[in-house]
């Protein structure tokens, strides 16, 4: 089963916010997911992001692939750097 970390759209028309979910890659965008690991609100001035950092790192270490947008969000939050440091320090 290929697992992805990706965004699920929530909110109302013209006012979206997103949940960062871990889901099977074959599931629909807003369909079944395994776990919610954070949220992202692009409408706030500073693009508010909340993450369960330990869970994200655990899923990445298990082989979950982040989508391009989620990869950018994780990079800005410093999670990808921590993941690469832990991966190559072994």
Swiss-Prot record:
UniProt KW keywords: Ribonucleoprotein, Ribosomal protein
A UniProt-annotated Pfam family: Ribosomal_S16
Cited SUPFAM superfamilies: Ribosomal protein S16 (SSF54565)
GO cellular component: cytoplasm; small ribosomal subunit
A molecular function (GO) term: structural constituent of ribosome
Domain of life: Bacteria
One record GO biological process: translation
InterPro entries: Ribosomal_bS16 (IPR000307), Ribosomal_bS16_dom_sf (IPR023803)
Similarity field: Belongs to the bacterial ribosomal protein bS16 family.
NCBIfam families registered for this protein in UniProt: S16
The protein's name: Small ribosomal subunit protein bS16
Organism: Streptococcus thermophilus (strain ATCC BAA-250 / LMG 18311)
Lineage of the species this protein comes from: Bacteria, Bacillati, Bacillota, Bacilli, Lactobacillales
Gene of this entry: rpsP
């Amino acid at each position: 089963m290929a697992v992805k970390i990706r965004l699920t759209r929530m909110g109302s028309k013209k006012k979206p916010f997103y949940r960062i979910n871990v889901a099977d890659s074959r599931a629909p965008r807003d369909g079944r997911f395994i776990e919610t690991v954070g949220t992202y609100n692009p409408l706030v001035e500073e693009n508010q992001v909340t993450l369960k950092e330990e869970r994200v790192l655990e899923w990445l270490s298990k082989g979950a692939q982040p989508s391009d947008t989620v990869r950018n969000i994780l990079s800005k939050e410093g999670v990808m750097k921590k993941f690469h440091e832990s991966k190559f320090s072994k």
